[in-house]
Amino acid sequence: MTFGIDDLPVRDELRGKSPYGAPQLDVPVRLNTNENPYPLPEALVERIAERVREAARDLNRYPDRDAVELRTQLARYLTDTSGHPLDVSNVWAANGSNEVIQQLLQTFGGPGRTAIGFEPSYSMHGLIARGTGTGWISGPRHEDFTIDVPAATRAIDEHRPDVVFITTPNNPTGTAVPAETVLALYEAAQAAKPSMVVVDEAYIEFSHGASLLPLLDGRPNLVVSRTMSKAFGAAGLRLGYLAAHPAVVDAVQLVRLPYHLSAVTQATALAALEHTDTLLKYVEQLKTERDRLVAELRAIGYAVTESDANFVQFGRFADSHATWRKILDRGVLVRDNGVPGWLRVTAGTPEENDAFLDAVREVKKEQHT
């Protein structure tokens, strides 16, 4: 008899579950994980090598435990791009925004506590909640994937969650959440508990609108999380961060592992922040390609959700997984997120997007013959 997971004394709530993960397939065009398709510029690669070489001289020592220089530069980046003044006391960094979320749930969630998100949304919120023993509540959305504010506030009032997740732009739909919606949910959360409200802005640099960082003023229970994986084109770096009241930054340090950010990670992230202007030019190119995908998909005859991210949700399909397979058979990998009738495609290079559009045109024609 084969020994497997079910034979181990794992927690009951983990039994029968599957780990998070998008398919990793060797195909000509991969547009399924919302990566930035542009390699880092050579000048940045050289600067990373210089900074890592400097850091390597001290690898016999532990890194800066609190990543003060990195947090200072992240605060400067947020201030410069949002107009909202922040300093090192407002920023915390970790190994990807998923670790940021994990630390928040370890601090404010956990056994006997709950978190709510409005689905479909970023699935890792619920998965990390489960991993930290936090009860998960799925909140409502309208059919157009916008948040149903009256229903959402009723859900918050009924369940009185300890943590509220709001993703804007939302993943996988791409829809942005207006500031007034965030404020309404924040007020509902404070009246019910009070609760921590986490605004996940992983894709905000691609948005038509502005960051919600200015909402931090006077709202100590509000947190904005970010990542360097998307706009900075550094998915392989694994660097996420949050902005919040200094008390929140102090609180998450109660659960962070010692020396959690390696010296190499800190050095690489600092090098990337030195090249912000160059990297954000790629963001503008991707926004143009994103808008082209929206227009072309609609012209082909697909329904498309309004997108403020670097990806587009399109449909409607009688069998979305079968359509995903037909696109894959043409050498293009997109994402089936499990949203019935819909698929998601990442904005790639113009050449990658052309290949994708050719594939879906063929699929559309095949489905109508």
Curated annotation (Swiss-Prot):
Entry keyword annotation includes Transcription regulation: no
UniProt pathway: Amino-acid biosynthesis; L-histidine biosynthesis; L-histidine from 5-phospho-alpha-D-ribose 1-diphosphate: step 7/9
Cofactor annotation: pyridoxal 5'-phosphate
PROSITE patterns: AA_TRANSFER_CLASS_2
Keyword Amino-acid biosynthesis (UniProt): yes
Reaction it catalyzes: L-histidinol phosphate + 2-oxoglutarate = 3-(imidazol-4-yl)-2-oxopropyl phosphate + L-glutamate
InterPro entries: Aminotrans_II_pyridoxalP_BS, Aminotransferase_I/II_large, HisP_aminotrans, PyrdxlP-dep_Trfase, PyrdxlP-dep_Trfase_major, PyrdxlP-dep_Trfase_small
GO biological process, one term: L-histidine biosynthetic process
Disulfide bond residue pairs: none
Coiled-coil region(s): none
Any one GO molecular-function label of the UniProt entry: pyridoxal phosphate binding
Cross-referenced SUPFAM superfamilies: PLP-dependent transferases
Self-association state and partner proteins as the record states: Homodimer.
Protein name according to UniProt: Histidinol-phosphate aminotransferase
